[in-house]
Amino acid sequence: MGKGNGKSKDSKGSEKSSTKTKFFVAVMGAGSVGKSALTVQFTQGVFIDKYDPTVEDTYTKTFELDGEQVCIEVLDTAGSEVLVAMRELYMKNAEGFILVYSILVKSTFLEIKDIVEQLFRVKEEEEVPIVLVGNKIDLDAHREVSTNEGKQLANSYPNCDFWEASSKDRINVDNVFFSIVKRIKEKYKKEGAPVKEKKEKCIIM
């Protein structure tokens, strides 16, 4: 997939600027699980049906959640087989994490555990906002990972939600990103830390 320089543009190609509550989220997981497809479907409403290994790309979108305008900046990271050394940088900077596996490939699910272990080690926090996503449920007949396995793994971590999704059919795509914002806000609320408003360039929908 051809990608731009990471700047956010509206449907007419012009950059928008607005003061919003902003959250920085990293999407992580093995290669070919659909991280880019999930991210682009949410931010641009387009399904990518061709696999093009990502090095790193950033997308932003503004939307209303619980009566509040929020801006989410999403870092679409490389598959874990590429640029593994950069994982720690993503982990240090992001406020929340969407961890994606393919329900069609068991090894991508098992790899999530390694990512989470490294995540907690790098963040040095008891609770890290996480949303676990079993992607490609439009191909459910070929699944290797059951829904219950996904739920059990999510339940083993604090502050973690679980969704099964389809980037192709846009099933639960919005819920995934809404959930991670809610998890981040809950964490700040527990810590008594204010969520700062920043003037950022975001897609105005």
UniProtKB/Swiss-Prot annotation:
Stored Gene3D superfamilies: P-loop containing nucleotide triphosphate hydrolases
Chain residues in the propeptide: 203-205
E.C. no: 3.6.5.2
Compartment annotation: Cell membrane
GO molecular function, one term: GTP binding
Keyword line: Cell membrane, GTP-binding, Hydrolase, Lipoprotein, Membrane, Methylation, Nucleotide-binding, Prenylation
Family annotation (InterPro entries): P-loop_NTPase, Small_GTP-bd, Small_GTPase, Small_GTPase_Ras-type
Reaction catalyzed: GTP + H2O = GDP + phosphate + H(+)
Residues with Cysteine methyl ester modification: C202
Biological process annotations from GO: negative regulation of cell migration; negative regulation of positive chemotaxis to cAMP; positive regulation of substrate adhesion-dependent cell spreading; signal transduction
Top-level lineage group: Eukaryota
Keyword rRNA-binding: no
Residues involved in GTP binding: 29-36, 76-80, 135-138
GO cellular component, one term: plasma membrane
Family, similarity comment: Belongs to the small GTPase superfamily. Ras family.
Protein name: Ras-related protein rapB
Organism: Dictyostelium discoideum (Social amoeba)
